[in-house]
A protein has these predicted regions:
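Catalytic cores of nucleic-acid endonucleases
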Residues: 154, 178-209, 213
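Single conserved hydrophobic/aromatic residue that forms the stacking wall/gate
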Residues: 1-8, 13, 207-215
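Structural motif
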Residues: 170-172
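Hydrophobic/aromatic beta-strand patches that form the interior of the parallel beta-sheet core
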Residues: 114, 174, 203-205
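Active-site donor-binding loop signature of nucleotide-sugar glycosyltransferases
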Residues: 118, 176-178
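Alpha-helix C-cap/termination motif
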Residues: 5, 147, 166, 196-199, ...
Length: 215
């Protein structure tokens, strides 16, 4: 289990998650509601759940509006965008923009949002149907930000490089994967890195689960 360690080891897992969820709701969400005088608290909660369930996925205020708007009364993408910005201002989530490596320009739509600590996700949404590849990507994003890098999602010839991390004259490219056991998967993950023509370091970070030794 990776994440914040806020409670004593004598507490059961469910109690820990209840405590962590309460910390998130009390210290972050409720403070945001009060600071920005948010009336539609249900919408805020739905946006939080959506972003938690879609860490490492491309998201925008419009596609979130379309998703949530189909479930309840009509909502406006400007309101959703404001609520997303409030969550980022409170450091609950971090927005990472897309960057066209060849064109050397930022792309104006579909950013990625990373959760400040994915233990909040466990606590509020549980572990069912969790994509560990996206969780690993979230961990890498937060660690890069913690180390002082400016972080972007790289786009090159319509292919994605998970991270372009820049700090002063330093630049690194990173692909993250939880499984490259199949050749097609390996080629898909590595191909974008091989197409980058500069001399900056390029890494592929993998999660490998331990396997029992034969015999």
């Amino acid at each position: 289990e990776i994440g914040v360690r806020l409670v004593g080891s004598e507490m059961c897992i469910r109690d820990r998650y209840d405590y962590i969820a309460d910390v998130f709701d009390t210290l972050i969400v409720r403070d945001i509601r009060k600071k920005y005088k948010i009336r539609n608290t249900q919408l805020m909660d739905r946006i939080v759940d959506f972003l938690m369930d879609n860490v490492s996925n491309l998201s925008s205020a419009r596609n979130i509006t379309n998703t949530l708007g189909s479930m309840q009364e009509k909502i406006h993408h400007t309101t959703v965008g404001n609520y997303m910005q409030y969550l980022c201002n409170a450091f609950a989530f971090y927005k990472v923009r897309r960057y066209d490596i060849k064109g050397k320009k930022y792309l104006s739509s579909n950013d990625k949002y990373y959760l400040s600590d994915h233990t909040f996700r466990y606590a509020k949404l549980g572990t069912k149907n969790m994509d560990y590849g996206r969780i690993l990507e979230n961990i890498v994003a937060i660690e890069l930000l913690r180390r002082g890098y400016e972080v972007y999602v790289g786009i090159l010839y319509k292919k994605e490089i998970d991270f372009v991390a820049v700090k002063r004259s330093e630049k690194i490219y990173i692909q993250v994967s939880d499984n490259i056991s199949e050749e097609k998967t390996f080629e898909r993950e590595v191909a974008p890195l091989l197409q980058i023509k500069d001399a900056y370091p390029k890494y592929c970070l993998l999660y490998t689960s331990p396997s029992p030794r034969d015999g």
